[in-house]
Design a protein with these regions (language model features):
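Single conserved hydrophobic/aromatic residue that forms the stacking wall/gate
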Residues: 1-12
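His/Asp/Glu-rich mid-to-C-terminal helical/loop segments that flank catalytic regions of hydrolases
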Residues: 129-130, 140
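Structural motif
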Residues: 14-57, 83-127, 144-150
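Short, well-structured beta-strand/strand-turn elements
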Residues: 8-9, 72-79, 140-150
Length: 150
């Protein structure tokens, strides 16, 4: 189930039931916010069916697509439109957060993926989500931050 309210969104899922892909079109308030587009794309990537995402606000909001593909997502981009065909499972991979919203989508995809997902560039995610790994861990997610010293 998915609930999208004025100030929040909730997604409930179980491994026994695949959710249905959704179509969204971003536009200025009060329409669907561009800041949630990447997370919905991660949701559609593992949902049943095909979701169409139209990005009307920012031209560069699909930067996370190559990394979702690396995890097994079936996504095709044509200009400002992404076609997301749901797959039964994603696979852990080494990916890079190139921006805050795309990075959070990679975290969500990584939580659902089979195997280990390593995300570099998490400093960008930190800008918008304080202690996100602690929050997700408190909800039962298997996630940890590992510092890498060069």
């Amino acid at each position: 189930e998915m609930y999208i309210g004025d100030w929040s969104s909730d997604v409930c899922s179980s491994d026994l039931l695949r959710t249905k892909a959704v179509d969204i079109e971003t536009s200025p308030y009060p329409a669907f916010p561009t800041d949630m587009q990447a997370q919905i794309m991660a949701f559609d990537a593992i949902s049943e069916g095909t979701g169409i995402i139209i990005e009307n606000i920012f031209e560069t909001r699909f930067k996370h697509v190559p990394d979702l593909r690396r995890m097994g997502a079936d996504i095709t981009v044509h200009g400002d439109v992404a076609v997301v065909r749901g797959v039964r499972k994603l696979y852990g991979a080494e990916v890079h957060a190139s921006d805050l919203r795309g990075g959070s989508a990679l975290v969500l995809a990584g939580l659902k993926a089979e195997g280990v997902t390593s995300i570099s560039g998490v400093g960008l995610i930190d800008r918008g989500y304080e202690s996100f790994e602690k929050t997700l861990s408190s909800l039962g997610a298997k996630i940890q931050r590992i510092s890498v010293n060069d």
